Amino acid sequence: MNANVKTFSFDRKKVKAGILHFGVGNFHRAHLEFINSQLLETGPDMYGWGICGAMILPQDERIYNVLKEQDGQYTLTVCGRDGNNEAYVIPSLIELYWGYRDQEAILNKIADPAIRIITMTITEGGYNQEKSTGRFMLDDEKIRHDLGDPKHPVTAFGYIAEGLRRRRDARAGRITILSCDNLQHNGDTARRTFTAFIEAQDKDLAAWLKGNVTFPNSMVDRITPATKPEDVKRLNAQNGTRDMAPVYAEDFIQWVVEDNFAAGRPAWERVGVQFTDDVTDFENMKLSLLNASHTLLSYPSFLSGYRKVDEAMHDERIVRFVRAFMDKDITPYVPAPKDTDLEEYKQTLIERFANRTVSDQIARLCFDGVSKFPVYVMPNLIKMIRDGKDLTRVTYLLAAYRHYLKYHIDDRGISFEIDDPWLTDNDKELIASDNSRAFLHLSPFQSTDLEQSDNFSAQYLMFVDAIKEKGAMKTLEAII
């Protein structure tokens, strides 16, 4: 290990788990684990807040085995916008279980009075909601399994319900469930979906839940690319390490949390976490500017032949497109949170997207558009249609999304595979249709009838034809 790889000096052997985390993916390891390692460094009074990881998916086996072999530790490389990187050994993950090997251990951990917070990164799609209504889908195959076989769960809902049942029976006390997923009102979403599942399974437990579990909202932010095999080699060479589970992320990090904890909490404010009574303005700013802009640039950039975000954001045409979207389409609907300079925030976003040392994959941004459009794009689009705003950039985006899903080929003639796992059978029929209007009835757009807006429909149809005839970039050039 190179001398410049930083280590934390707290006594790891004295740290006990006070947090159980579901979903030990790259973002969690670059965000909460980094924050918590910094917290543990502040003093022994925080040693009761180590993290126990719970991995419950079949595909988690490889990374579980690697992390177990590495005693839960790994390197995080923080990539500076100035081109300078800093690497850390992250030690706050002190226990780790995989559901296909350690199911009882995970369930009993939820019932352990030492565990006072359950955190989660289970992705936008993991909350099992119908895209257009937000209804919890009780007819999902895995959900039906967990409803019928509570003691052998396969979903986060099943695990947490059975664990809470044991916690209640053991009189182990109240607990907080804290979503760290990139959803607006993620705590409200968690409360609604977990309540729906538990009410369908055990009404007595549902009554206990209401009085003993809190679900704070939180806003998380740190761009964390997927780590590919070539990244593993590069990071190990750069850091002088032999780490089979490294992660890398940008230098920006933010976490804003509603201060609503049922059984105490770590003093995360010591290391820069912002606590507030209401995270709404922070959520709106981040989801409407960062996430919506990511979606806006993803499909046009990918169709134009770009594969890395930083490369696309060094194309002045795309920068102008994204900045116009931020300034003209989004800013009128985003009140700045207290003590936040919105102009500075937008400029920082442009710099973050262009960070060459992070070099995020555009394919990651394109992934699961069905889950992203309802959260990041549709709320403001509905307001824009209502207010008679210029719809040029958003209609172009939807036309580009259709082209991406339908034709699987970019402007250079290079074919690609799409990755949108939540497309329904009906969605696939609408995409395959030669009637371009049919696409406007795709499941992520069902919160409003886009076809009823003549202005929207006309512009969208024009861009559908233009992208097919001239390509995504040539079409974009005409509107910036």
Describe each region flagged by the PLM:
Residues M1-I480:
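Substrate/ligand-engaging "lid" and interaction regions
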